[in-house]
């Protein structure tokens, strides 16, 4: 059996010298699961050596004590001193190391500054790359939300990815992430090893619900709650202890690891001792609070008898590993059934190697009939279906069983994640479109759960007559999910109920799989026409997770920042409708190209073919980050699959529609064909100005003064665009303002303002006509107008800012 599924009881702490890795939704130490149970430490007032840590004796006592409290991981906000490294090694503590840099101001505008930050990261990482106690690095922590909006989310994301790449180059065997927070929820570098989020929610129900959302943002990677705590100055020590107890219980069920903020009340930041917050498990005098001794609440989890059903047809290449993983499940009451659907290869000899497995054979009748036979033979009240090319996580059934704690949930499932590839082709296919994916109505309830990881109440399955026999290869899971929901049942997604699912190892097998999916869609259309659109594609109520990663597209208009960028939970909102490029691929365009060639319209044929390639490139751009690194040559092959996959799948679906007489029944309104968008109009940068001040002046004061002094109407931006104020004009030239205030040390602030000219289509056409009629005169008129608007805006802003004492204008 592969090492990545050979897991036993989660280790309290890794053995000395054993590095922590990631595998799917969890951390591992060797072949054992490892759950970081961490606490933050520092930053402190510099010691005698200038290090942001306590003196040697105090440091040793602190780390020894927190180890005695049961913590196995320490989060640091600065690189550790040599003394701290020695103590961590002695106590077998894992360290998550923060790498601080000048992130409080505009760090992107100057190339020299960017290179300096990258070099700083590489230097610090290189110093620690071989230390066995360093588990992971954070390349940043909670970048200020209005600063990210000012710099541009995509640009900041790209820079964080550069930092991770640079760090990984210096320490290829360490883990890297960025400590995010809800106010920039969308800001997730695509190359992180795990998702880290600082969350402060005081109500247990709110925290539990938000955890579910964070798992979808994490995708197929582990979720680490990198900060969570409660201020005793506000809520009291009793509430802190109670909160820590339920926090640990929730994380044990739904997160790969957690960090409590913080060990002590001591907190030194920006050269100042912070004394008005008291989050520590110990106070400044090291007096222990009740929360330090709090233990996780005991949660009574359901433990029904579960029948695991594996249906196979000639699956000799993967069945042995599948059964090996199933016999090692950490669950007290289950059985394993293998349903041999008339295989021509020797399934019996493989099953014979597992005495606890019941092998049941039928004449070849297809997947649905095999699933039904398994249900009839099963003794369990829960039927857990998986495929013969899957390998179950050791806690798979534990998570599935917990999902049936309420009668309304009739089916549960979790993620299916590609394991390390067996060859180069499987590495490409793992990143290709068309893999089995769950469809979510909200963060907890699913519309569809893939059949490779699907548990159903036996009573609910029998009530709808089981699986339909005509789904012989694929589509059975979609049909069963829709029918369960039509009967009022609800489907639950459980992020921890993970299976490894091998993707196809040859391109031919992948394309045959997609052809099978297309044929199954025709069958589904016959049975459920209301779920299919005019061109034959399935129409879901929920969002599909798989082919398009929900946090990858940071295009303006998809993020809701809130008025003036102050939204507390700033997330990405996707409509689920089609963009115009989605119409340019598939069978229809191949037919149009063929017709154009036959008619001799070669230019049109070339144009149509080029547009279909453009659609493939766009599809490739929107795919999730490849689970395994791809070379440029492999990316070219992936683009080719993005082009050919819709053709193969749609062609098979169309063929099935014709033979079955299937017709779609969903009638969309015209607005549903295209994605609704909050994209900004064309904008031209008029200029940028900066004002330095003390703590008495910021962007809100500037915007308020400008609003009061501006002679015309002023509109507040709606929160979808990276704007604060909009100054409309009757002639089609609208000016907009974007602001940010940078908070530097010793109370120094820098408020920046950017003026943008918004151009309507009419003004663009008018400018084009003027330039065409007379290039020189038109250019002079346009440049004069821009200069006038820039100067006028600058004068108004300067007057508003300099009207306050202590404000000075900075020269660029």
Ranges and model annotations:
Residues 149, 154-253, 280:
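Extracellular glycoside hydrolase catalytic/binding regions
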Residues 414-415, 429-447, 462:
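Short, flexible, basic/aromatic active-site loop/helix in glycosyltransferases
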Residues 383:
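Short aromatic/hydrophobic "clamp" motif used to bind/position activated sugar donors
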């Amino acid at each position: 059996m592969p090492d990545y599924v050979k897991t036993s009881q989660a280790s309290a702490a890794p053995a000395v010298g054993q590095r922590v890795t990631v595998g799917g939704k969890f951390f591992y130490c060797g072949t054992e699961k490892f759950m970081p149970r961490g606490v933050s430490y520092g930053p402190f007032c510099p010691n005698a050596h200038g290090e942001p840590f306590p003196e040697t004796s105090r440091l040793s006592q602190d780390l020894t004590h927190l180890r005695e409290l049961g913590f196995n991981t320490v989060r640091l906000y600065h690189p550790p001193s040599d003394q701290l490294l020695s103590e961590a090694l002695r106590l077998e503590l894992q360290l998550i190391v923060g790498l601080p840099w000048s992130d409080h101001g505009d760090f992107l505008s100057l190339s020299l500054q960017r290179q300096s930050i990258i070099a700083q990261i590489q230097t610090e990482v290189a110093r620690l790359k071989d230390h066995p106690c360093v588990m992971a690095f954070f390349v940043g922590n909670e970048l200020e939300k209005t600063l990210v909006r000012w710099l541009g989310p995509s640009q900041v994301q790209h820079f964080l990815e550069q930092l991770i790449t640079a760090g990984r180059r210096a320490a290829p065997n360490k883990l890297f992430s960025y400590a995010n927070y809800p106010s920039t929820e969308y800001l997730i570098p695509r190359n992180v090893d795990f998702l880290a989020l600082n969350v402060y929610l005081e109500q247990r129900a709110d925290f539990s619900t938000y955890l579910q959302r964070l798992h979808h943002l994490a995708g197929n990677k582990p979720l680490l709650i990198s900060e969570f705590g409660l201020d005793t100055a506000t809520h009291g020590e009793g509430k802190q202890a109670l909160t820590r107890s339920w926090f640990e219980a929730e994380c044990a069920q739904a997160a790969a690891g957690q960090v409590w903020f913080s060990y002590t009340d001591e907190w030194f930041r920006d050269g100042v001792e912070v004394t008005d917050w008291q989050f520590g498990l110990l106070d400044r005098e090291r007096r222990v609070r009740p929360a330090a001794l709090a233990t996780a609440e005991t949660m009574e989890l359901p433990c029904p008898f579960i029948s695991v059903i594996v249906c196979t047809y000639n699956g000799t290449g993967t069945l042995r590993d599948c059964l090996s993983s199933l016999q090692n499940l950490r669950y007290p009451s289950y059985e394993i059934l293998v349903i041999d659907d008339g295989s021509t290869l020797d399934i019996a000899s493989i099953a014979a190697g597992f005495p606890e497995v019941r092998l049941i054979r039928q004449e070849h009748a297809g997947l649905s009939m095999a699933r039904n036979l398994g249900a009839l033979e099963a003794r369990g009240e829960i039927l857990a279906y998986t495929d013969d090319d899957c390998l179950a996580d050791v806690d798979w059934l534990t998570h599935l069983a917990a999902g049936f704690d309420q009668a309304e949930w009739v089916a549960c499932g979790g993620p299916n994640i590609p394991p390390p590839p067996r060859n180069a082709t499987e590495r490409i296919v793992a990143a290709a479109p068309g893999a089995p994916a769950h469809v979510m109505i909200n963060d907890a309830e699913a519309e569809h759960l893939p059949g490779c990881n699907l548990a159903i109440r036996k009573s609910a399955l029998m009530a709808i007559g089981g699986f339909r026999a005509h789904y012989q290869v694929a589509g059975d899971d979609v049909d069963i999910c829709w029918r369960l929901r039509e009967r009022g049942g609800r489907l639950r997604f459980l992020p921890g109920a993970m299976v490894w699912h091998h993707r196809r190892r040859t391109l031919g097998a992948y394309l045959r799989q997609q052809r099978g999916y297309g044929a199954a869609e025709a069958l589904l259309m016959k049975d459920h026409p209301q779920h299919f659109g005019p061109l034959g594609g399935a129409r879901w109520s929920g969002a599909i997770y798989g082919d398009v990663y929900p946090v990858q597209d940071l295009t303006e208009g998809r993020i809701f920042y809130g008025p003036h960028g102050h939204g507390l939970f700033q997330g990405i909102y996707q409509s689920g409708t089609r963009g115009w490029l989605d119409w340019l691929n598939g069978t229809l365009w191949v037919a149009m190209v063929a017709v154009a060639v036959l008619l001799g319209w070669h230019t049109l044929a070339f144009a149509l073919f080029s547009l279909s390639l453009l659609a493939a490139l766009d599809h490739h751009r929107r795919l999730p980050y490849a689970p395994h690194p791809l070379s440029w040559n492999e990316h070219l092959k992936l683009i080719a699959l993005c082009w050919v996959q819709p053709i193969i799948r749609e062609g098979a679906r169309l063929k099935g529609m014709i033979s079955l007489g299937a017709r779609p029944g969903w009638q969309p309104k015209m607005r549903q064909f295209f994605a609704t968008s909050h994209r900004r109009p064309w904008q031209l940068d008029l200029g940028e100005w900066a004002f330095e001040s003390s703590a008495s002046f910021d962007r809100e004061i500037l915007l308020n003064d400008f609003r009061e002094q501006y002679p015309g109407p002023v509109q507040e931006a709606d929160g979808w665009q990276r704007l604060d104020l909009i100054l409309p004009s009757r002639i089609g030239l609208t000016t907009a303002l974007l602001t940010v205030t940078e908070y530097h040390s010793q109370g120094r602030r820098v408020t920046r303002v950017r003026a943008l000219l918004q151009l309507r289509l009419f003004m663009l056409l008018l400018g084009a006509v003027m330039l065409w009629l007379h290039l020189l005169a038109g250019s002079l008129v346009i440049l004069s107008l821009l200069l006038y608007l820039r100067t006028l805006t600058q004068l108004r802003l300067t007057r508003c800012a300099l009207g306050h004492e202590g404000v000075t204008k900075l020269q660029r």
